[in-house]
Regions:
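Short, flexible loop segments at boundaries between secondary-structure elements
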Residues: 138-144
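Short, well-ordered secondary-structure micro-motifs
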Residues: 18, 45-48, 96-99, 122-124
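A short acidic, glycine-rich active-site loop
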Residues: 54-68
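Small/aliphatic-rich secondary-structure junction motif
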Residues: 3-53, 76-85
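Glycine-rich, Arg-bearing micro-motifs that act as flexible, cationic patches
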Residues: 109-135
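Short, hinge-like loop/turn segments at secondary-structure boundaries
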Residues: 51-54, 102-105, 128-129
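Structural beta-alpha unit
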Residues: 75-110
């Protein structure tokens, strides 16, 4: 039924649990996984020189965070014996990166947490999960 599952993660505790559950789902269905993390780009500043130095530091920090998230996910997949690719994107609208990556990678479904780092604010402002559910043409499994 499913051959390739996209598993987005933001590194939050629930998201890590969703990665574990998504990898188990892949193992049970014989699917391979692609784990995606999406970081937010650096907010622009009118102070060009200051922004350049801060921008580089911000990018380095975001890359480190993304690499750590993906290493955790890859380790979970490796322990389960599931083939897993990893991707990191930077986007102001993470849901778009999730939907586009699922399409580009020719995934059959998306397996993701019900909410992430934004917590209550995410619920009030509209969660990325809700946006993925609205915009994806693929089945979306929501882990709670």
């Amino acid at each position: 039924m499913f051959k390739h599952i996209l598993i987005p993660t933001d590194g939050s505790p629930l998201s890590i649990e969703a990665v574990k559950a998504g990898i188990r789902f892949c193992k049970e269905t014989g699917a391979r996984a692609t784990v995606l993390t999406v970081t937010l780009p650096f907010p622009n500043s009118p102070l060009a020189e200051y922004a350049a130095a801060t921008h580089a530091m911000y990018d380095a920090g975001m890359k480190k965070a993304a690499d750590e998230r993906l290493a955790v996910a890859a380790g979970i997949a490796r322990e389960a014996g599931v083939t897993c690719a990893t991707r990191a994107h930077s986007d102001w609208q993470p849901f778009l990166s999730i939907v586009q990556t699922a399409d580009e990678e020719k995934c059959d479904a998306i397996f993701m947490a019900s909410h992430g780092r934004r917590g209550i604010a995410g619920l009030l402002l509209g969660s990325e999960t809700q946006k993925v559910l609205t915009h994806s043409k693929l089945p979306v499994v929501v882990y709670r």
